[in-house]
């Protein structure tokens, strides 16, 4: 009744084509609103929801930091435990075991978190672990994150087995320059795609 009496011709509701976090309205409820408010234009409240969710309380900042610190600590532990005979599946199980012990959730699907790639011939993207080990001079890549206190982290790490050749060193320097450029573009009001573009411009 309150909304029907309002003068607003446009009503923002929680649907969004691009942001699933702001897309909470079911299609059925959307249709019901259309029936109840035939003279109103229903528009996405995605921008408003995004801005509100982007504001974090001190407690939320602490929980986000704790999730990131926990993830980084587990990755450090994996690096210390790693041996040349460790397979991708072994590395996944090492992290999963500690997550189960501590009661942490995975930042994305358990079967794919962590994602571990051993060597240059490994499949790319979020893949299931195999029996590959890291050949000398090649990389171990781990993409991993835990959920702790309701907040998720997402961290990637690369380690090299043995000596670092000039090609890997050059790639490392390029990526570091891109990260530095993205970091320099961060600040209040910064838009994600602009930060991303600043980083990619270095590659």
Where are these regions (language model features)?
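Active-site neighborhoods and metal-handling regions in enzymes and metal-associated proteins
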Residues: 1-203
